[in-house]
């Protein structure tokens, strides 16, 4: 079984509109999903610990953890299964800065170079969460929480970057699973037969991640008036 899981501390105002659009795109595709609303003040550590709770409860399932407000599902259920099932642990990716370095820690590029050769501009870990088998995700989180004390204002992106650079998992450099639009460039994306395409890697990403304030750049032409994504 595959589960798409989202964590939020509020769903109201414009966030509600964006979340409901995402929810409808998953329902239309028949993708099981679960959303957890945490009423506590937001902390990235809480999201990581919630992810650990989820995978411990269902260790044999496959998971895709995403943000709740700035994501759309634009693929199909079968394509998602094909993209996720071969991997024990995978991380979605961000595009490199214009200087070739990762945000927000440019000094760690050398560690990425040592970990794996870059195969596309989307070569650095995105903070939306892990993808893969429940048991593998649980093991990775337990490793990270056992190795480092989560900083008071630390992000899950920094946490998962440390986990990845310590040898856990792989990066979705081809953007087969998710496409982040941060630092997008002209000529990198297109739409063919109603499907969003990465013209650099040739992939048809299953998710589009607008990375926060980039929401207006999501190709809303993929969404009919009902809010569901086109088949």
Predicted regions located by residue number:
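Conserved donor-nucleotide/metal-binding helix-loop-beta segment in metal-dependent transferases, i.e.
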Residues: 72-116
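A generic structural motif
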Residues: 33-41, 91-95, 152-157, 172-177
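The feature represents the membrane-entry module of six-transmembrane cation channels
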Residues: 12, 17, 23-39, 83, ...
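Catalytic core and acceptor-binding pocket of nucleotide-sugar-dependent glycosyltransferases
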Residues: 122-229
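N-terminal anchoring/stem segment of glycosyltransferases
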Residues: 1-62, 86, 135
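Short, aromatic/basic amphipathic alpha-helical patches
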Residues: 17-28, 103-110, 219-224
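A conserved donor-nucleotide-binding helix/loop in the catalytic core
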Residues: 40-66, 70-76, 122-125, 155-164
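Short, high-confidence coil segments that cap the C-terminus of an alpha-helix
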Residues: 60, 85-89, 203-205
């Amino acid at each position: 079984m595959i589960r798409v899981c989202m964590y939020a501390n509020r769903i109201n105002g414009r966030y509600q509109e964006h979340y409901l659009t995402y929810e409808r795109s998953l329902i239309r595709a028949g993708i099981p999903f679960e959303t957890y609303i945490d009423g506590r003040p937001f902390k990235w550590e809480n999201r990581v610990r919630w992810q650990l709770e989820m995978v411990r409860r269902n260790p044999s399932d496959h998971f895709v953890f995403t943000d709740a407000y700035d994501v759309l599902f634009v693929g199909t259920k079968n394509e998602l299964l094909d993209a996720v099932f071969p991997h024990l642990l995978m991380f979605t990716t961000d595009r490199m800065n214009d200087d070739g370095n990762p945000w927000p820690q440019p000094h760690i590029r050398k560690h990425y170079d040592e970990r794996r050769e870059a195969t596309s501009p989307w070569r650095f870990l995105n903070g939306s969460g892990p993808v893969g088998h429940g048991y593998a995700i649980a093991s990775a989180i337990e490793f990270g929480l056992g190795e480092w004390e989560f900083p008071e204002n630390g992000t899950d992106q920094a946490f998962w970057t440390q986990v990845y650079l310590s040898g856990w998992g792989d990066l979705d450099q081809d953007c087969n699973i998710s496409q982040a639009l941060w630092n997008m460039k002209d000529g990198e994306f297109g739409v063919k037969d109603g499907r969003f395409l990465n013209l650099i890697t040739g992939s048809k990403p299953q998710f589009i991640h607008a990375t926060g304030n980039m929401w207006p750049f999501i190709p809303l032409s993929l969404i009919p008036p009902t809010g569901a994504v086109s088949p």
